[in-house]
């Protein structure tokens, strides 16, 4: 019996995929189809898939062409599979010509003609056409515009104050302007992704979320860290009981960029420390320990009293069975690490932890320690855009950051704005 194996993502299974499977099937007696897993696709920079692994497997199974379907989960698996399944022929599309010649050492490699005029990328772009404009200036907007180019079906377009010609808006203006800018976009029937905090008060936030629901629009709290694979896996590991009960979460986010701490610096157009770094630092605390803390204490060192611009701020939270703290600064420097303390071990994320691509689970016995590595492209921004586009397409809200977490973040910032803090 001649065994043939082929691999692919098979997102939105189309005629080209089916023709390739038919040609592969004709090469032998038994066809094995390897389907790339969601995580493996991310490591290869493929972030645009619209279907999950199980949906793609089901579509291939429905064709009746595959005798066996397996998941491709890591680089180098093809050699292992060829050996494990005693494969005679490796078949792949001609667009990979020469790429897999090294497999000739293990079996016969055949490059099959590719069906012209059809591709998953084109289908994804047709199915999901979202034009996004931006409100704001500076590095955040530039990064967002650059990363949007990597997302199928999403196009950035310059827009004026009327917001005409776009379906959605990215808001990265000064936090004090977020409420007005988001409200203007929602009134104009535009979906919105806004850098956190979405508003400076709970009343403003609730008004905006109510308006979005009333108009069936998507309003997303934009914290890029929430969308990275490593960060989401970190949450799962922490909540799984692997390190025991969580008793403390400590997050530090600082930067000296922008010369905020220099004498005579114009701070009027800059974000203060609590707005620039607070949402990111508070994210793992509220996602791991919840939002129902017993008390919070804010201690700050101000750069400018009239602008309420903090050079450094520390916030401590007390829960029933845990504590947490954040340190944020734009005119002070500390190690930007995240430490989650448990009764059996702890999780350590090195600086800059908010660009999470690696974390360690550590124990008293170092032989039990485990390191986790995950691909991170574009600081998580392109994953954020993909999630936003899917939310708009499916008309569902943001499940990466819950409404309760967004409110808890704003509540702390609101307390700071009211000067409910101790000054040092």
For each predicted feature, which ranges?
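N-terminal Rossmann-like dinucleotide-binding module
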Residues: 128-164
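Rossmann-fold dehydrogenase core element
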Residues: 207-224, 245-249
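Nucleotidyltransferase catalytic core that binds NTPs
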Residues: 1-130
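N-terminal Rossmann-fold NAD(P) dinucleotide-binding loop
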Residues: 17, 141, 178
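Contiguous beta-strand/loop segments that form the cofactor/metal-binding neighborhood of enzyme cores
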Residues: 276-355, 386-396
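Beta-loop-alpha module in the N-terminal Rossmann-like domain of NAD(P)-dependent dehydrogenases
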Residues: 144, 160-211
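Predominantly a Rossmann-like dinucleotide-binding segment in NAD(P)-dependent oxidoreductases
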Residues: 226-294
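C-terminal helix-rich "cap/oligomerization" subdomain common to oxidoreductases
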Residues: 134, 149-150, 168-171, 218, ...
């Amino acid at each position: 019996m001649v065994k043939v194996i082929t691999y692919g993502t098979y997102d939105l299974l189309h005629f080209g995929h089916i023709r390739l499977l038919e040609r592969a099937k004709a090469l032998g007696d038994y066809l094995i189809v390897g389907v790339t897993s969601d995580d493996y696709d991310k490591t290869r920079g493929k972030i645009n898939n619209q279907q999950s692994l199980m949906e793609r497997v089901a579509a291939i199974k429905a064709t009746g062409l595959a005798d066996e379907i397996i998941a491709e989960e890591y680089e180098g698996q093809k050699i292992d599979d060829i050996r494990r399944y005693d494969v005679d022929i490796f078949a792949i599309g001609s667009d990979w010509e020469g790429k897999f010649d090294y497999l000739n050492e293990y079996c016969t490699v055949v490059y099959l003609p590719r069906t012209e005029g059809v591709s998953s990328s084109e289908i994804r772009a047709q199915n999901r056409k979202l034009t996004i404009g931006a409100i704001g200036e500076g590095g955040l907007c530039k990064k967002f515009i650059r990363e949007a180019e990597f997302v199928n079906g999403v196009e950035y377009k310059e827009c004026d104050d009327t917001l005409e010609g776009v379906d959605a808006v990215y808001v990265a203006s000064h936090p004090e302007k977020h409420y007005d800018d988001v409200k203007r976009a929602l009134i104009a029937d535009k979906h919105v992704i806004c850098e956190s905090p979405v508003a400076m008060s709970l009343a403003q936030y609730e008004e905006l979320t109510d308006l979005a629901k009333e108009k069936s629009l998507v309003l997303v709290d934009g914290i890029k860290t929430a969308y990275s694979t490593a960060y989401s896996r970190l949450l799962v590991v922490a909540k799984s009981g692997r390190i025991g009960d969580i008793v403390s979460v400590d997050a530090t986010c600082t930067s000296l960029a922008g010369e905020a701490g220099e004498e005579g610096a114009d701070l009027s157009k800059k974000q203060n420390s609590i707005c620039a770094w607070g949402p990111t630092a508070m994210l793992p605390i509220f996602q791991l320990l919840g939002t129902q803390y017993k008390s919070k204490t804010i201690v700050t060192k101000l750069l400018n009293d009239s602008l309420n611009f903090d050079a450094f701020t520390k916030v401590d939270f007390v829960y029933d069975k845990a504590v947490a703290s954040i340190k944020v600064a734009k005119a002070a420097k500390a190690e930007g690490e995240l430490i989650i303390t448990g009764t059996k071990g702890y999780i350590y994320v090195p600086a800059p932890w908010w660009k999470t691509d690696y974390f360690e689970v550590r124990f008293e016995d170092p032989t039990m320690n485990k390191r986790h590595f995950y691909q991170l492209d574009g600081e998580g921004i392109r994953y954020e855009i993909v999630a936003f586009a899917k939310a708009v397409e499916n008309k569902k809200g943001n499940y990466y950051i819950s409404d309760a977490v967004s409110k808890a973040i704003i509540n702390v910032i609101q307390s700071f704005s009211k000067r409910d803090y101790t000054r040092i």
